[in-house]
Swiss-Prot record:
Superkingdom, natural source: Bacteria
One of the record's GO molecular function terms: uridine phosphorylase activity
PANTHER family in alphabetical order: PYRIMIDINE/PURINE NUCLEOSIDE PHOSPHORYLASE (PTHR36540), PYRIMIDINE_PURINE NUCLEOSIDE PHOSPHORYLASE (PTHR36540:SF1)
E.C. number(s) listed in UniProt: 2.4.2.1, 2.4.2.2
InterPro entries assigned: Ppnp (IPR009664), RmlC-like_jellyroll (IPR014710), RmlC_Cupin_sf (IPR011051)
HAMAP family: Nucleos_phosphorylase_PpnP
Record protein name field: Pyrimidine/purine nucleoside phosphorylase
Length: 105
């Protein structure tokens, strides 16, 4: 999944703001109808709910993640990714600004 840029896409101008601005992203729309979000999460402990299944690709920074139903935390950093099932949730702890791409499945 390591791609440095996305070509021939449309970007939604309005930012997605979550958790009082602790997570900020922009939606990228692809010609085949798929979408991704490019964003940052500032230092915080947050819980995200998912509708669609997601793959979170980490571009920069580090985080700890706990998927719904698990007691175990997993650490992720730049160049790594984790998957979240649809209609689920995950907890994320960020100590330094996290740069990510969310791939919706």
């Amino acid at each position: 999944m390591e791609v440095s840029q996305f070509d021939n896409v449309s970007v939604v101008k309005k930012a997605n703001l979550y958790f009082d601005g602790k997570c900020v992203s922009h939606t990228v729309l692809f010609p085949d109808g798929t979408r991704k979000t490019l964003g940052v999460i500032f230092p915080a402990s947050l819980t995200f709910n998912t509708g669609a299944a997601e793959i979170m690709e980490i571009n920069a920074g580090t985080c700890r993640v706990r998927l719904a139903g698990s007691e175990d935390w997993q650490a992720y950093g730049a160049g790594q990714q984790f998957s979240v099932p649809g209609n689920s949730s995950f907890d994320i702890e960020v100590q330094e600004t996290l740069d990510y791409v969310c791939h919706f499945e």
